């Protein structure tokens, strides 16, 4: 009997000691949970279930997981599970340190870049047309800027170029390579500055020094200036850019010869003018007399003419000129 009582006392003491230990463990775990820590020693360990905040009104209950009794679940816990893409607040009811949260976000970012990339790769016709149209407009702007810089277009020329680019449907997608003007047309004694102007210069045949001819807007003007100076220095043996404009042409007549020719022509014209004036005066005198007589006769009215009946009432002595002459001669002879 005594031994049985002693055994019962020892069992009670052990039970009370175990209960005290359990209470201490519960207090310790509660303190850890309230301070932000959690206990997770493995799949077969004890877990706390409840709210993550220490101010939860519900009492925390300690439950024993039943995973240790299922060997299949234990083996599944042994295999590594891939991390989920959801956030920690949704996946776990426990507080995770910031380092683990940042690591999960870094491994599985939740940004819309992937969605944008999927939208760009998708075969939606609207999404394919928009980038193509934008690229075509950009190419047109590049071409317009290129030709405007080369041709130095005015505002009207710029509008014409824009209309031409709009009308053309088969525009090249790449900008044509820039070719210098010197590669297309070369002139002797002409070179181009890097800002677009053209200069001309020539070497003198005697001392081989360079003679500056000037700066020009076009290569043709500079080539003409070189040809003029080369023709002056070397004559017909000069190598010119435009030989058809200078060679095989009539030599210009001297100035004094032109003056002599003009003097002789002026003298001849003056002499001819004098002769014409004298003949005109002679003819003019006769013509004036006849014209005056005709005008006098024309001024007499028709009824006063010689055949008019008005003269019948007047009796004029009719005399002959011969009789008058004879009478005068007879009278003169009598007196003698």
From Swiss-Prot:
Induction: Induced by drought stress. Induced by salt stress. Induced by abscisic acid (ABA) and heat stress. GO terms for biological process: ethylene-activated signaling pathway; positive regulation of cellular response to heat; positive regulation of DNA-templated transcription; regulation of response to water deprivation; response to salt stress. Gene3D superfamilies: AP2/ERF domain (3.30.730.10). It is found in: Nucleus. Residues 1-60, 247-280 are annotated as: Disordered. The keyword Oxidoreductase does not apply. Residues 1-10 have a biased composition (Basic residues). One of its GO terms (cellular component) is cytoplasm. It comes from the Eukaryota. SUPFAM superfamilies: DNA-binding domain. Residues 186-243 bind DNA. Ubiquitinated by RGLG2. Ubiquitination of ERF053 leads to its degradation by the proteasome. InterPro entries: AP2/ERF_dom (IPR001471), AP2/ERF_dom_sf (IPR036955), DNA-bd_dom_sf (IPR016177), ERF/AP2-like (IPR051758). SMART domains: AP2. One of its GO terms (molecular function) is transcription cis-regulatory region binding. The keyword Transcription applies. Interacts with RGLG1 and RGLG2. Belongs to the AP2/ERF transcription factor family. ERF subfamily. This is Ethylene-responsive transcription factor ERF053. It comes from Arabidopsis thaliana (Mouse-ear cress). The gene is ERF053.
